[in-house]
Amino acid sequence: MPAHIRLAVPADAPLLPRIERSAAQAFRSIDGLGWLADAATLSVERHRQLIALSTCWVAVDAQGQPQGFLSAERHGSDLHIEELSVCQSMQGQGWGRKLVETAMDHARSNHLRCVTLTTFTHVPWNAPF
């Protein structure tokens, strides 16, 4: 099966912190943000909570293994992206954008007002968002 995006399932939860750590290594190349590479990740329990809400999606490779994820939570009529991470080996291939588009499609189909994300705008890969 080709790489694709699907809703996360409980068995994915223990795999997601590794992806977040891998993705965060890219911050080492940004002055003043290297500390993010060593920052705490979302806990497995928090991932399980978001998976239970059906607001967590994973980008899986051709072998079906998660390589990226987007975790979000509904706040009133908004969907807030809590974490978006793509492992280094899949970065630069559009998977982050596809995950965001998936969350936006979810928000539209559930008649939510907007999708929010808190990010660093001066980081090149964050700028489009």
Spans of model-derived segments:
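Conserved acetyl-CoA pyrophosphate-binding loop and the N-cap/start of the following alpha-helix
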Residues: 90, 94-102
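Conserved GNAT acetyl-CoA-binding A-motif
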Residues: 107-119
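Conserved active-site alpha-helix within GNAT-family acetyltransferase domains
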Residues: 97, 109, 121-129
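A short beta-loop-alpha structural element at the N-terminal edge
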Residues: 4-18
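A short helix-loop-beta-strand connector motif used in the catalytic cores of GNAT acetyltransferases and
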Residues: 44-58, 80
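Conserved GNAT-fold acetyl-CoA-binding loop/helix
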Residues: 18-46
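A short, internal acetyl-CoA/4′-phosphopantetheine-binding micro-motif in the GNAT/acyltransferase core
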Residues: 84-91, 119-121
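Conserved beta-strand in the GNAT
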Residues: 58, 65-73, 80-85
